[in-house]
Regions:
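Membrane-embedded helix boundary and interhelical linker motif in transport proteins
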Residues: 53-57, 66-87
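Core transmembrane helix bundle of multi-pass membrane transport proteins
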Residues: 1-12, 76-102, 106-286, 350-351, ...
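Helix-loop-helix junctions within the multi-pass membrane cores of secondary transporters/permeases
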Residues: 62, 84-109, 118, 288-359, ...
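Hydrophobic alpha-helical segments embedded in the membrane of multi-pass proteins
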Residues: 19-23, 38-48, 64-66, 92, ...
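The feature marks cytosolic C-terminal regulatory regions of anion transporters and related permeases
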Residues: 370-504
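Membrane-embedded helical hairpins/re-entrant loop segments and their flanking transmembrane helices
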Residues: 3-15, 20, 24-57, 250-332
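Short, non-helical or kinked segments that cap or interrupt transmembrane helices
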Residues: 32-41, 55-68, 106-114, 194-201, ...
Length: 504
């Protein structure tokens, strides 16, 4: 696609992604025990570096909520400077993995699981943003795990939030949702103004203006500083270097550093592959991202991020889905969002500090709903149980655990149905009177052993069975042994067994 031709769409999307990414970068840095500016660095590198090197048209990268536990433990154990060495090494490992074509792993994620992951992220966005929408900002922005670092969980946090309602925050979040919803309506999208200006920007500006009105006219509704975006600012000219932390390379051979590096590389790569596959699923142009190239791009970005004091990064579904839903066409939106993030924290940090978190919660509400619309569940149900059950298992598992564990559980359920289908379709048994024909229709592995035993048990006495392997190129040794055993036991039941294209 021509980047120049579609830049008007990409710029609008970049603004939306920037507004979504800003609090997530800060929240994940806070939860990881890292300097707040480390989250900003990671978001900038994820946008610009990955955007330039990756072939993904719509994926957006940044600090990952799924790594916060690993990062927090590593920083506590190693110290931040040594941890940065681990991030650099993790990047190197990812680059090597890309050259070794490890990206092929991403092709093995079932579609039902990927769709379940997207729907689960939508539910999590809605549930996790409710406390922020009502003015209870204890849990960090971007948390996706059911069990939180503050001892609460997603559901108990909702109960807790109702005891700390902030009227002004509620008004702003409702205003944000209304703006986002009406702006997307067909009646308004007919006009160029509404197609050009991002609704998320209006929601945020409106939230800032509402809080300004509260300050001057409705003091009981004022949203205080702790419920606003907290962006680090320069206290004195020339102090920008104070925001950067540099790695301690004397720790490069530290065994603990190496273990953390491999752990980060493995988890970050897996999350990236999952998120890339999921993003490709909702790309309206159905483009396919080269996964090995993506691993290399992520590796280079992690290397750079670690070198200048940033956190490990991955492709992130929340940012990517916001990008796609806002109408992005090319990766220019990803790069532009990184540039906006860079320029805004340098030039207008004081203005960013006026943004209510509840305004951003409204934006994420709408993003979450689009990911988990009822129509998605209806569609998966129509596709049959073999698609719906892995889908719904993935949704529930992710919502009540975390992303990676939930996906793993979903894959197990999907594999069960794959094996069940394979058992059913690999052999066909037909009969006419006491004459049976057992035809092997595809390659038969040891997994089919139980199927053969069950079929053989059902063959009645004084009958005849022909086992035809002419359509099967491979028959596992265990299956051959099962057939051989049946030939021995069938003599007692006066069953005649004939083999066709099968050697025992």
């Amino acid at each position: 696609m021509d980047i120049k031709e579609y830049f008007k769409y990409d710029f609008k999307s970049a603004v939306v992604v920037f507004l979504v990414a800003l609090p997530l970068c800060l929240g994940i840095a806070l939860a990881s025990g890292a300097p707040l500016f480390a989250g900003i660095i990671t978001g900038i590198v994820g946008g610009i570096v990955v955007g330039l090197l990756s072939k993904s048209p719509l994926s957006v990268s940044g600090p990952a909520a799924g790594l916060t536990t690993i990062v927090l433990a590593a920083i506590t154990d190693l110290g931040y400077e040594a941890f940065l060495v681990a991030v650099i090494l993790a990047g190197v490992i990812q680059i090597v993995a890309g050259f070794l074509r490890a990206g092929a792993i991403g092709h093995f994620f079932p579609a039902s699981v990927l769709k379940g992951m997207l729907a689960a992220i939508g539910i999590i966005l809605i549930l996790k943003q409710i406390p922020h929408a009502v003015g209870y900002d204890v849990d960090f922005e971007g948390d996706q795990s059911f069990f939180q670092n503050d001892g609460q969980n997603t559901l108990s946090e909702l109960m807790e939030a109702w005891e700390y309602l902030t009227p002004g925050a509620i008004v702003v979040s409702i205003f944000s949702v209304i703006v986002m919803t009406l702006w997307a309506s067909n009646s308004l999208q007919r006009y160029a103004f509404f197609r050009t200006i991002p609704s998320a920007l209006i929601a945020v500006v409106g939230g800032v203006l509402l809080n300004t009105l509260f300050v001057h006219a409705f003091p009981d509704f004022v949203i205080t500083e702790k419920h606003l975006v907290n962006v680090p600012t320069l206290k004195e000219e020339g102090s920008i270097l104070a925001f950067f932390t540099f790695p301690d390379f004397s720790q490069i051979l530290n065994q603990k550093v190496l273990i953390v590096a491999f752990t980060i590389a493995a988890v970050a790569s897996l999350e990236t592959l999952l998120n890339i596959e999921a993003s490709d699923k909702i790309d309206p142009f159905r483009r396919i991202t080269p996964l090995n190239r993506e691993l290399k791009a992520q590796g280079v970005a992690n290397l750079i991020s670690g070198a200048i004091g940033g956190l490990p990064l991955t492709s992130v579904v929340v940012r990517s889905s916001a990008n796609i839903q806002s109408g992005a066409r090319t990766k220019a939106s990803t790069i532009t969002h990184g540039l906006i993030l860079l320029l805004s924290v340098i030039l207008i940090p004081r203005i960013l500090q006026l943004i209510p978190l509840s305004a951003l919660a409204g934006i994420l509400f709408v993003t979450g709903f689009k990911l988990t619309k009822p129509a998605i569940y209806k569609e998966m149900y129509k596709n049959g149980w073999s698609q719906f059950l892995p889908f719904i298992a993935t949704v529930l598992a992710i919502v009540f655990t975390n992303l990676l564990l939930g996906v793993f559980i979903g894959i197990l359920v999907a594999v069960f149905f794959i094996l069940k289908t394979n058992f059913r379709e690999s052999v066909i048994l037909v009969s006419e009177g006491n004459n049976f024909l057992l035809r092997l229709t595809k390659d038969v592995s040891f997994l089919n052993k139980a199927t053969f035993r069950d079929l053989f048990i059902g063959i009645p006495s004084n009958s005849s069975i022909t086992i035809d392997g002419s359509q099967s190129h491979f028959i596992d040794h265990d299956v051959r042994e099962t057939i051989k055993d049946f030939m021995e036991t069938s003599k007692a039941k006066n069953i005649q067994v004939h083999l066709k294209h099968i050697e025992i």
